[in-house]
Amino acid sequence: MILYRLLSWLPFPLLYAAAWLAYVLLYYVARYRRAVVQQNLRRAFPEKSEAEITSLAKSFYHRLAQVAFEIVKARRMRREQFLERVRLVNPERLREASDGLRESVIVLTIHQGNWEWMLHGASIALDIPIDPVYKPLHNRTVDRLIYDIRSQFGSRPLSMAESTRDILRRRREFRIFVMVADQSPIRRERGYWTRFMNQEAAFYQGAETIAKMTRFPVLFAQCRRLRTGYYEVEFHEVATPPYDKESHEIIDSYVRLAEQAIRSEPESWLWSNRCWKR
């Protein structure tokens, strides 16, 4: 916690200098999940040379360190800083989907750019609370820290275990529910398997199930890095009701948009995940 407090108070130039040192430690010293990252990159981009894979891996670790430190910094950032550093490209898409911010919407995204800053930037710019659905971390101290960061501007984080019940109970209230849906379920036999980045991957079906039960429209939020410490968010349509109960149109559309986003900026996606492990 002492380190967290120190990092959160650092001005941005010093924060990114510290992030560079963390990148060196992660990649060269600790070699944090290097084998997993390189294997994932090789499978996703079989056309790339080994030199290109290594370069992409290094860029990923540098971005990972920067994003981690930015998330810590978020606790000390003002609303004006988020408005300056996170730009919404097409907020009208969200307003249209929500019938003028009156009907609830499910927004799916991926671990790309800075998904935590995206939450704050959109919530502040639109002046509405955005409720993220999250998977609790094993470390209770870190989990509480992340919870506090996510809820600092009025958002109400929902754990995956309580999300369906809570969303159904409040289905007549206007809310924006955000789900980072690119993690594989622990019990992969319960997931929906489809082709993703040249490999078969399992995806949680919860977001699709909730959308069909509530008839909420579904959007995809793509977070792009413009330069160090600055991002833009663009919304894309995933699916709108009525939904076919027998199809997986929502997941299929989400996976297609997720893959397009990753291929456009591969170094900023979370390659350390074991997405394709059966």
Stretch-by-stretch model annotation:
Residues 35, 116-117, 143-144, 165, ...:
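Residue-level marker for well-ordered alpha-helical positions
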Residues 84-91, 112, 139, 157-160, ...:
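A conditional alpha-helix N-cap/helix-loop micro-motif detector
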Residues 29, 55-58, 99, 124-125, ...:
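Non-catalytic C-terminal accessory region of glycerolipid acyltransferases
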Residues 2-6, 59-60, 83-84, 110-112, ...:
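Short acidic/polar alpha-helix capping motifs at helix-coil junctions
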Residues 1-109, 143-144, 148, 154:
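Membrane-anchoring hydrophobic helices of lipid-metabolizing enzymes
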